[in-house]
Amino acid sequence: MILKNTELGRLHESGVYDSFTFEQTTRLCARLLDMFNKAGVAVIRMGLHASRDVEQEMVGGVYHPALREIAESILYLEKMNAVCEDGGKYVFYTDKRNISKIIGQGGANRNALSQRGISFKIKEEKGTDLRAE
């Protein structure tokens, strides 16, 4: 995120600096989150908490109140892509806290798999990250 009255803000406004797109940002966050998780480093917070003041001071870059959820959703899509064959029908088992991430923001993961002819149902299984049948 790029804020007014900062050095980065001035560079952005003068055209010297251009920020990442939303997709670049969310994919980078997903990669970093995955890297930290694999290293056993707990990521406590990702992004900024929702604030009208921050939004008013923003002149560029990416701000989304659900940045972490989107990053986690990208990682779930990658896991599902790794186990799914085109045209297949699957049941994914997961803890209830993961269901919205598996479906994706606005159904993004469901839509992405649907484009490959993949359909799936989700069943709750306490303590399970993701398991496919």
Specify the residue positions occupied by each region the protein language model found.
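Radical SAM enzyme core and accessory elements
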Residues: 52-133
